[in-house]
Amino acid sequence: MTFVFREIQKEDYTSCADSLIAAYANEPWNNPWTLEEALLRIEATMSGFNARGYVIEYEGNIIAMCLGRIDYYFQNWRQFCIDEFNVTPHYQRQGIGRQLFAFAATQLKKEAIQQLFLLTGGAQAVTFYEKNGFLTSNEGTMMVYPLTEA
C-alpha cells in the first residue's frame, strides 16, 4: 500500500466529507452526518487564513484527515487546535492515525507551532490520543451556554 501524506486541497473536500461521515457513523459516536453537513464543517474549518489541513490519500480517496487552526498569542506563542481528526474505519487500528499525527506535527513545527490541542469525548478517543502522546490538561474548563431550549 502506498499512502500519500500531504496538505489538503479544496478538491479534497468531498472525499474528506465521505471520510468524516464514515468515521462517525458507528460506535462510539453514531453521528448521522449528511454530505451537506460534513462539507459545511470542512469548508468552515478550512475557511480562515490560519487554517491548516493534512490528509492521507490512498488510491484517490482521502482515508484520514487532520484539520484545524493556528491560535496566535502574545510573545509569539502559537498552538494548533485540532478541530477534526479522523481515520476511515477500514483503515483504523493500523497505525494510520499515528502516522498522520507525526506528519502534521512535522509540518506545524516548520511554522513554529509549540503545541497541539483538542477537545474530545469518549474513552476510546481519549485512549487513542494518550497513546499518541497527548496529555490531559487541567488548564481551564470547557463551558457551554445553550441558546435553545432542550
Feature-to-residue mapping (PLM):
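A short beta-loop-alpha structural element at the N-terminal edge
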Residues: 2-18
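Conserved GNAT-fold acetyl-CoA-binding loop/helix
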Residues: 21-42
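A short helix-loop-beta-strand connector motif used in the catalytic cores of GNAT acetyltransferases and
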Residues: 43-55, 81
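Conserved beta-strand in the GNAT
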Residues: 55, 61-70, 86
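A conserved beta-turn-beta hairpin within the catalytic core of GNAT-like acetyltransferases
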Residues: 71-82, 92, 138-139
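Conserved acetyl-CoA-binding loop-helix of GNAT-fold acetyltransferases
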Residues: 87, 93-106, 131
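Conserved active-site alpha-helix within GNAT-family acetyltransferase domains
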Residues: 98, 121-139, 145
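Conserved GNAT acetyl-CoA-binding A-motif
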Residues: 101, 109-121
